[in-house]
């Protein structure tokens, strides 16, 4: 039973001291990272004298705002606090008994003070000074006399002045803690709204006071309304001789003033946001950054959303787009642009947050982006997963996709088709209809989304976006669009879902059909990946209802299920999960756990789940001033980014020697020479030229492998496949207009030259050149000619270089060609027909081996690369082809060593009216024939321990031994086909040979054979009569029970081939393959699957047949004495970056 721990219940959670979830490749922290950490720490825990002053000031003013609000709303509360409130109102700070406007003002100031706004400090300081001056005047005659200030009131005024003075001193000494600014806004416009609003409210209030004057005189009514609406009741009541209206009217007057203030504040805040939004220049640069750097970011395009602000790194190569809600600067997704500049962009974002007193956060970051924020000191929380579909792997077949398959089938039967277009292909007169449908089908008043929504359907700047529509009765007068999906570009090969809508009255399954059709037609649009919706807290929905889920997981699941009644979180998860997507985690990054609730609320607001008052604010706009850093030329930077992208596609890092050769190449082209001309066939190979008498004119072509430049004359060794010869190039003999051979030719260059056969002064046979040209300029230097490629790994990886400089490698390649041709000719001369059978197969069979798997998109079908052609060749035998063979490639997903390669060449041959003994003679003679073709006699090459090559004669008959005979000899006891499993296990234990407990006697004998027979074999030897259980395609021995008519050919520990008397009994074959398929179903990757088509063919009767299979690569190894790496032109090698 699993223990429930927080780590197993929670998707991801961190605090300030815990390790964060994303773990990027560790790199030293950059200066920008250190700066970000310092800034974040400053935002979290302000330093310096009076660091807590803003919070204290904000709290005090906030308490006063709460008292003012409660006093304005609840009469009982107003009566309970009458005396202390009256003292505060008269002697410390204005606190009228009813004024919603003043409560609103105090609340704004409290929030601004706690956010360290300097303007709030000025407001509070100036207000205190003015309030103190007005109260101090009451201590001075004749004002004191006019207002009837007595001794008791003087004492209270002095007490109030003392409290205000202390507060003023507190604000002055903590001035530096109030350093944050406010964003630029339309101050005069907001002031105009305030003046108009307060004037209108005063006039309305005057009317109310006139209608219900209470004890007010006619001349007092307008000033009284002004006092309550505009000055929030700050004018001393004694001004009106204690006269007042009804308390309800007072509350109404305060409410009117509050409404005017709210309207003005809304205009100011709205203008602040508008002034900070990205401009068209910002968007242009962001698009260039996305194109250059964010190919792998599925949310990058949403950074062009125009109701976001943007901050760039100082070099302009990275940016963060964000929005401010409830004092949280919320970035959307990962930073945009060059990852090398991400730390600088994050530092600039934190600087901005620090300047304006925002709490920084980022929503929807990928693991890579969260790692960048992690390096800057942020915490992170996994908030869900993004659903990614890989179009080449997407299929609606299989039990897991039943629901989607049924939905698609239902929709197609209803006559629904799918239309897919780029937005740029939608006519201008049709796009408004698309937008209208999207608005009509939206189930909320406002468009939701922030990190994964663009919120501007139909903008011509987004012509690359993809529109998928479900259409009923397409092409008829009744044509009707009933569903739509809109996707934004995701790099070059993907799209991300932006809009999903459908007509609620349409048939169910419209969305599933659109998604499926997009995947099916993805290749037409160059799409390989589709990003669908975001599933919030997927781990809870996936694991919460499961048996064994812990209490925290279950509690979280219950809470989210309750929330899903309002926000459709569970339905969104299920709508994604049914496509079996690849889930990519997304993170919420934040400064501090203590601020997490506020960040969460800001995220909910930005996503549109909670609507704050907007007062007619438009949805789409670009305003404000550009955020591109001073000193950055945006047009020049965009041009640079575009050129970088072009260079990235073609340029690679080149060593110095290569750069020198490339420079020489450029110079030759500028001088009019073609280093890569069309073909002009030479008249002679080098071998033919060597055979010609002196004085013969020849034209040869080859690669320069050695040069000796003596100024006026240059000697160069040139070779082609046939041989090598010296070229003598004398400047005086070469026709004019030819490049300078000594300075322009490098080792490795391909040249073609004309001259006569002659000799140098030292007597060496040479071609005396009178004209030459380049056939190909070699841009990389060749290894040393004498030592060549000394690293065996390099010889394999750069086989082309090895062949160019190593005659032995060319000889081995030629020998392989001779051997393969000899094998083919040997069988053809004996009446065998060569055929070709499929390499892509639906069933893997013909041998016990692990196959490679692939997929065909056209049929949406999983396929295997063949492990053997046997079953198809046997079909031909059923069809009457009496002698047949194939030389071709097979593929087995197994190990790589000196004798194994995942892809290899095999020869399989079948002869009717034959058996395994006849195939034994045929195989021996065939290999002897191939050895004779390679070496002129039936010998093979063996390399001894000292590296010396020895020729071994393989003529005549080869040893033939039974498997049980060699196993008995090696074990020291007699082993037969009747030996019990327990006895065989005892022998293995004694010899320390490992075996599996579920093996039968035949499999244990086979394991003993591999250790005691095969591994110890030297000269070519046939081992016959294998246990029947290990040979499912082989006929049982005609006279020996328990064994099959099969042999293996082994030489020096390597199996070269095998042959059977083929099993032609369809009933017995079905039993054996059924047993193999059961093993495959139980998880044995090497067991054969049941090939029903082959069994059906066998039921048509196949003549008695002998079959053989020989590894061509291993025969080449045997004949040449080399490993499989040297025997193959291009063996499989591990990638250099693996």
Curated annotation (Swiss-Prot):
Matches recorded under CDD domains: LysRS_N
Entry protein name: Lysylphosphatidylglycerol biosynthesis bifunctional protein LysX
Keywords: Aminoacyl-tRNA synthetase, Antibiotic resistance, ATP-binding, Cell membrane, DNA-binding, Ligase, Lipid metabolism, Magnesium, Membrane, Metal-binding, Multifunctional enzyme, Nucleotide-binding, Transferase, Transmembrane, Transmembrane helix, Virulence
A Pfam family that the UniProt record links to this protein: LPG_synthase_C
One GO MF term attached to the UniProt entry: phosphatidylglycerol lysyltransferase activity
Domain of life: Bacteria
DNA-binding region, residue intervals: 698-772
One term under GO cellular component: plasma membrane
Phylogenetic classification of the source organism: Bacteria, Bacillati, Actinomycetota, Actinomycetes, Mycobacteriales
């Amino acid at each position: 039973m699993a223990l429930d721990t927080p780590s197993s219940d929670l998707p991801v959670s961190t605090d300030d001291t815990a390790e964060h979830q994303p773990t990027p490749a560790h790199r030293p922290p950059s200066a920008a990272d250190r700066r970000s950490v310092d800034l974040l720490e400053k935002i979290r825990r302000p330093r310096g004298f009076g660091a807590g002053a803003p919070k204290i000031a904000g709290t005090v003013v906030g308490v006063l705002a709460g008292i003012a609000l409660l006093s304005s709303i609840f009469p009982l509360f107003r009566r309970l606090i009458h005396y202390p409130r009256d003292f505060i109102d008269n002697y410390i700070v204005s606190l009228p008994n009813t004024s919603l406007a003043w409560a609103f003002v105090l609340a704004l100031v409290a929030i601004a003070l706690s956010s360290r706004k300097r303007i709030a400090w000025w407001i509070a300081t100036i207000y205190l000074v003015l309030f103190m001056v007005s109260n101090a005047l009451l201590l001075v005659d004749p004002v004191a006399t006019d207002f009837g200030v007595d001794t008791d009131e003087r004492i209270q005024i002095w007490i109030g002045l003392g409290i205000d003075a202390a507060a003023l001193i507190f604000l002055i000494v903590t001035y530096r803690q109030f350093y944050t600014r406010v964003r630029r806004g339309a101050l005069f416009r907001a002031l105009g709204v305030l003046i108009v609003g307060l004037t209108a409210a005063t006039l309305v209030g005057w009317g109310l006071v006139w209608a219900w004057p209470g004890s007010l005189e006619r001349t007092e009514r307008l000033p009284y309304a002004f006092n309550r609406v505009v000055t929030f009741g700050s004018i001393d009541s004694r001004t009106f001789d204690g006269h007042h209206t009804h308390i309800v009217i007072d509350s109404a007057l305060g409410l009117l003033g509050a409404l005017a203030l709210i309207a003005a504040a809304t205009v100011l805040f709205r203008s602040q946001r508008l002034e900070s939004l990205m401009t068209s220049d910002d968007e242009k640069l962001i698009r260039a950054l996305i194109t250059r750097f964010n190919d792998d970011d599925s949310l990058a395009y949403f950074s062009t959303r125009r109701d976001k602000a943007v901050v760039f790194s100082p070099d302009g190569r990275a940016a963060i787009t964000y929005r401010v809600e409830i004092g949280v600067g919320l970035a959307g997704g990962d930073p945009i642009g060059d990852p090398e500049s991400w730390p600088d962009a994050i530092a600039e974002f934190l600087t901005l947050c620090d300047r304006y007193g925002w709490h920084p956060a980022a929503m929807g970051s990928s693991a890579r982006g969260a790692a960048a924020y992690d390096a800057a000191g942020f915490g992170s929380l996994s908030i869900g997963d993004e659903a990614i579909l890989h179009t080449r792997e997407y299929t609606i077949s299989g039990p897991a996709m039943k629901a989607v398959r049924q939905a698609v089938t239902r929709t197609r039967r209803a006559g629904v088709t799918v239309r897919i277009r780029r937005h740029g292909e939608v006519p201008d007169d049709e796009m408004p209809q698309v937008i209208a449908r999207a608005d009509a089908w939206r189930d909320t008043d406002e468009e939701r989304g922030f990190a994964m929504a663009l919120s501007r359907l139909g903008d011509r700047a987004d012509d690359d976006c993809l529109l998928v529509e479900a259409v009923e009765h397409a092409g008829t007068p009744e044509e009707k669009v009933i569903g739509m999906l809109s996707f934004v570009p995701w790099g070059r090969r993907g799209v991300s879902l932006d809009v999903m809508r459908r007509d609620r009255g349409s048939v169910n399954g419209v969305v599933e059909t659109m998604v499926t059709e997009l995947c099916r037609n993805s290749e037409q649009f160059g799409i390989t990946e589709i990003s669908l919706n975001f599933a919030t807290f997927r781990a809870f929905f996936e694991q919460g209802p499961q048996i064994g889920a812990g209490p925290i997981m279950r509690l979280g699941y219950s809470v989210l299920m309750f929330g899903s009644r309002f926000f459709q979180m569970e339905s969104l998860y299920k709508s994604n999960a049914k496509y079996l997507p690849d889930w990519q985690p997304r993170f919420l990054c934040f400064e501090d756990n203590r601020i997490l609730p506020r960040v969460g609320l800001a995220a909910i607001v930005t996503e549109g789940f909670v609507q704050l008052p907007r007062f007619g604010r438009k949805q789409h706009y670009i305003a404000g001033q550009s955020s591109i850093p001073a000193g950055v030329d945006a047009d020049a930077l965009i041009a640079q980014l575009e050129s970088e992208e072009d260079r990235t596609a073609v340029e690679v890092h080149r060593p110095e020697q290569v750069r020198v050769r490339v420079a020489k190449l450029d110079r030759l082209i500028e001088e009019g020479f073609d280093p890569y001309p069309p073909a002009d066939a030479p008249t002679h190979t080098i071998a033919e030229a060597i055979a010609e008498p002196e004085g013969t004119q020849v034209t040869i072509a080859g690669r320069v492998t050695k040069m000796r430049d003596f100024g006026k004359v240059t000697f160069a060794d040139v070779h082609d496949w046939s041989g090598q010869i010296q070229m003598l190039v004398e400047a005086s003999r070469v026709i004019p207009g030819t490049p300078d051979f000594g300075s322009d030719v490098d080792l490795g260059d391909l040249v073609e030259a004309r001259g006569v056969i002659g000799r140098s002064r030292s007597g060496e046979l040479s071609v005396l050149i009178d004209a030459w040209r380049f056939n190909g300029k070699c841009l990389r230097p060749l290894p040393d000619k004498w030592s060549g490629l000394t690293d065996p790994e390099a010889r394999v990886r750069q086989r082309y270089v090895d062949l160019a400089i190593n005659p032995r490698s060319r000889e081995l390649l030629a020998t392989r060609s001779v051997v393969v041709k000899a094998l083919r000719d040997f069988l053809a001369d004996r009446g065998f027909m060569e055929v070709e059978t499929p390499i892509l197969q639906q069933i893997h069979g013909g041998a016990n081996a692990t196959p490679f798997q692939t997929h065909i998109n056209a049929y949406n079908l999983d396929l295997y690369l063949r492990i053997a052609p046997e079953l198809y060749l046997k079909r031909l035998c059923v069809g009457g082809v009496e002698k047949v063979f194939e030389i071709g490639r097979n593929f087995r997903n197994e190990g790589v060593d000196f004798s194994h390669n995942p892809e290899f060449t095999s020869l399989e041959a079948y002869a009717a009216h034959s058996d395994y003994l006849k195939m034994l003679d045929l195989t021996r003679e065939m290999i002897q024939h191939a050895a004779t073709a390679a070496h002129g006699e039936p010998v093979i090459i063996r390399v001894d321990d000292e590296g010396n090559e020895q020729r071994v004669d393989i003529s005549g008959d080869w040893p033939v031994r039974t498997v049980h005979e060699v196993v008995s000899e090696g074990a020291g006891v007699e082993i037969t086909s009747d030996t019990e499993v327990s006895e065989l296990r005892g022998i293995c234990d004694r010899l320390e040979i490992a075996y599996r407990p579920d093996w039968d006697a035949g499999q244990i004998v086979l394991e003993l054979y591999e250790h005691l027979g095969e591994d110890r074999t030297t000269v070519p030897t046939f081992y016959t009569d294998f246990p029947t259980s290990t040979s499912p395609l082989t006929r049982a021995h005609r006279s020996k029970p328990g064994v099959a008519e099969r042999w293996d050919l082994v030489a020096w520990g390597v199996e070269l081939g095998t042959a059977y008397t083929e099993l032609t009994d369809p009933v017995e074959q079905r039993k054996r393959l059924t047993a193999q398929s059961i093993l495959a179903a139980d998880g044995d990757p090497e067991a054969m699957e049941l090939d029903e088509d082959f069994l059906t063919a066998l039921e048509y009767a196949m003549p008695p047949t002998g079959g053989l299979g020989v590894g061509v690569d291993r025969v080449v190894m045997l004949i040449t004495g080399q490993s499989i790496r040297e025997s193959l032109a291009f063996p499989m090698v591990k990638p250099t970056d693996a």
